[in-house]
């Protein structure tokens, strides 16, 4: 008889602590408008902070939160040093990662507004690629919290039409896409503007001559959009 016939297998979970890392840059004048910038898959907080500094007006506080799923990346050159990258979720219990993402944003916003560093009425959330749909989940789950949300070369939640978690918001929405994006092609994102308008009245959708990347024209338009909506 196979000994496995007498065994009972089951899956369990346990609670653990997770340390999240972020970079913060503050202007002299406070309380300041805040841009929270989240990177895409395989990147890190330093890379996204560089992007945020090129997109945000000078009077903005900048926060770059790093994804909590770490992985190794091959060296840039043969024989070189192995690198690290970070992501936000996988298809293994993604709801757990969504909760971590959401709670991290709530904690960061709560801390920075409580001490007067950030203007509670001028908080903006930006995501590139993988973090884009996660940010939309947060923005429409907390419809009164943000002044605006920006998505670059990313998607919208898969349960956008069916979930009761998403509420209408007065926050501005700016979605930027690349006409040569190999992951989010023009065909794939063709109905995004219409779908986002299901729960947001102030939606701007714009395409650029770009692949899966942030190009100078995008940076300029994001800066202008932030200036307008933070006024």
At which residue positions do the language-model features occur?
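Serine-hydrolase catalytic machinery in alpha/beta-hydrolase-like enzymes
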Residues: 12-118
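Conserved alpha/beta-hydrolase "nucleophile elbow" surrounding the catalytic nucleophile
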Residues: 39-41, 126-128, 178
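Active-site signature of alpha/beta-hydrolase-fold catalytic machinery across serine-
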Residues: 50, 137-141
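Alpha/beta-hydrolase fold nucleophile elbow
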Residues: 117-127
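Gly/Ala-rich beta-loop-alpha elbow adjacent to hydrolase catalytic centers
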Residues: 127-131, 135
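A conserved short beta-strand
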Residues: 144-156
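C-terminal catalytic histidine-bearing segment of alpha/beta-hydrolase fold enzymes
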Residues: 174, 187-231
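Short beta-strand/loop motif that positions the catalytic acidic residue
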Residues: 175-177, 181
